[in-house]
Each structure stands twice: as C-alpha cells, then as structure tokens.
C-alpha cells in the first residue's frame, strides 16, 4: 500500500533508532520513521 505522504518525517539524517526509506514527498531527503513509543 502506498501512502501519499511520509509516515514519519523528512530529513537528511535520521535518528539511529528510526527506520528510514525513500519517499516521493521527501524529494532527495530520507523518510525517517520513528519506532512506536512504548508505554
């Protein structure tokens, strides 16, 4: 399933705990997806 937006945030550098992917809305930046918060 393709969403029309990055599920996390667009950045040139993601946090070490983030998953990352490429997304068209982020252009040349990464789409950083933070892990789900526990608690």
Swiss-Prot record:
Keyword rRNA processing set for record: no
Residue pairs linked by disulfide bridges in the UniProt entry: 6-32, 10-26, 14-31
Temperature and activity: Denaturation temperature (Td) is 101.2 degrees Celsius.
GO cellular component: extracellular region
Keyword Magnesium in record: no
Compartment(s) where it occurs, according to its Swiss-Prot or TrEMBL record: Secreted
Keywords from the named record: Disulfide bond, Pyrrolidone carboxylic acid, Secreted
Family: Belongs to the transferrin family.
Protein name, per record: Small basic protein 1
Organism: Anas platyrhynchos
Taxon lineage: Eukaryota, Metazoa, Chordata, Craniata, Vertebrata
């Amino acid at each position: 399933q393709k969403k029309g937006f990055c599920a996390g945030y667009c950045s040139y550098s993601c946090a070490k705990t983030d998953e990352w992917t490429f997304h068209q809305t982020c252009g040349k930046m990464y789409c950083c997806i933070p892990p789900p918060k526990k608690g």
